[in-house]
Amino acid sequence: DGMSDDEKYAAALDAALGFFEAAGYTVTDGKLTAAPAGAKLSYEVMIGGGGKGDHPSFGILTAASEALKTIGFDLTINDLADGTIMWDALNSETAEMWCAAWQATLDPDMFQIYHSEGGSANYYAIYSDELDELVMEGRTNTDQAFRKAVYKEALDFIVDYAVEIPVYQRQNASVFSTQRVNVDSIPQDLTTFYSYLNEIEKIQMN
């Protein structure tokens, strides 16, 4: 694209100012100077980093906070030593912003998080018949191509609501010693949901 990192960051900040302005914030000389009714120039984001930044999203939050400060917005990071404080705040609907990691089941069912009657509905407060229908269509059909298309539509729906920003996807790694294990006996195509433990009875030692 021909842009340096500094140019990319500058363009991102300009875009951020545009989004803030579209949301009703007052922008003067490249700085946020006033917030619209119901909004603020400062927000707290909770993250369970053990009080020492031990979380995959902590670095991104820190960089975002530093960048936003240059345009007049204060993103305060509350790195919690006790993660239950954040979940209590979520359940009482007092958390302004927060970082967490969702774990999916073996079957990538979106019901547990995104359906209005799912266990985490109160975290996002999305009560949409359209989204509920997409989630139910996906979880009640065994055709993988169909499910993929339906879930993509549902995820696009969620992105449009802007209730979450996907940051990373965790991957697992399994390490075996070729001196101790017959690698030909290790299951092939291991995934997060299908590990060597699923066929551990077939693994042979050298």
What are these regions (language model features)?
Residues 1-14, 29-40, 88-93, 111-140, ...:
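Short, solvent-exposed loop/beta-turn-alpha elements that line the ligand-binding surface or hinge
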Residues 3-9, 13, 25-104:
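Ligand/substrate-recognition segments at binding pockets and active sites
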Residues 17-26, 66-73, 91-95, 100-103, ...:
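Sec-exported extracytoplasmic/periplasmic mature domains
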Residues 52-54, 84-87, 105-109, 121, ...:
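Flexible loop/turn segments at secondary-structure boundaries
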